[in-house]
Amino acid sequence: MQIISNDEHELLTTSQIELVESILQHAAQLEGVEEPSELSVTYLTNAEIHEVNREWRGKDAPTDVISFAFDEMGDEEMDFMLDEDEPHLLGDLVISVERCREQAADYGHSFERELGFLAIHGFLHLLGYDHMTPEEEAEMTARQEEVLTHFELKRGNV
């Protein structure tokens, strides 16, 4: 899977971006994501994600992660975008690095654990997972923890 990482403000280290990419690659393998496929991950400030949240979701507040799934587009929108030899476009993840740092401190675990959590959480949304019912939440939580545990990113390991 091709991952396009955008960190124009240099909010993360190279190793942190590589960790996110490794987490997403591992999750894609576990989920059987078709190849070739592509997604982008953009790292923003709280002010920037606040603007994205207001413009695209109608919510006037910053948030931690937003997923924009290409598969949620209508058939007409998809027809002109996809050729057979083009990668399957999964979508875009937008992560607030500031909110990530705040939440890591609030939850008492490492920044890397929270960053990994936000990445896998958003990625699973791109694949159609949700947490609207207790059953959906349990399934999504189990998948998230499976991936994070693989990378030894457990709760409380500051």
UniProtKB/Swiss-Prot annotation:
Taxonomic superkingdom: Bacteria
Keyword Membrane part of the UniProt annotation: no
GO biological process: rRNA processing
Record's cofactor remark: Binds 1 zinc ion.
Residues annotated to bind Zn(2+): 121, 125, 131
GO cellular component: cytoplasm
GO MF term set: metalloendopeptidase activity; RNA endonuclease activity; zinc ion binding
Enzyme Commission no: 3.1.-.-
Cofactor requirements of the protein: Zn(2+)
Localization per Swiss-Prot or TrEMBL: Cytoplasm
Short name of any one Pfam family annotated for the protein: YbeY
Keywords: Cytoplasm, Endonuclease, Hydrolase, Metal-binding, Nuclease, Ribosome biogenesis, rRNA processing, Zinc
Main location group: cytoplasm
Similarity section: Belongs to the endoribonuclease YbeY family.
Function: Single strand-specific metallo-endoribonuclease involved in late-stage 70S ribosome quality control and in maturation of the 3' terminus of the 16S rRNA.
Name recorded for this polypeptide: Endoribonuclease YbeY
Organism lineage string: Bacteria, Bacillati, Bacillota, Bacilli, Bacillales
